[in-house]
């Protein structure tokens, strides 16, 4: 996994290389005092969410908006192995 972005709330967004099926795994993780970490997994280019733990619906929407606005960069960096 490659680091992509750290948000002001300490949320980390990382991504895989381009996988054999042409998708890119994006993992979002945020530290939480009570639960240790909240996290979710999204696959590009379909924006398929496969796992959400600890995030509210509002947080999921916020992070998906960020992923959608930066997907072209994530896909490009994944193809380059960065």
Map each language-model feature to its residues.
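A short, structured beta-strand/loop element
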Residues: 14-55
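Residue-identity detector for glycine
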Residues: 8-9, 22, 54, 81
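Negatively charged, low-complexity tracts enriched in Asp/Glu with abundant Ser/Thr
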Residues: 1-15
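Acidic, low-complexity intrinsically disordered segments
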Residues: 53-82
């Amino acid at each position: 996994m490659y680091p992509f972005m750290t948000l002001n709330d300490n949320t980390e967004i990382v991504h895989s290389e381009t996988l054999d099926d042409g998708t890119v795994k994006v993992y979002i993780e945020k530290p939480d005092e009570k639960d240790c970490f909240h996290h979710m997994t999204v696959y590009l280019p379909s924006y398929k969410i496969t796992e959400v733990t600890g995030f509210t619906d509002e947080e999921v929407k916020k992070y998906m908006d960020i992923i959608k606005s930066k997907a072209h960069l994530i896909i490009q960096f994944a193809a380059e192995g960065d």
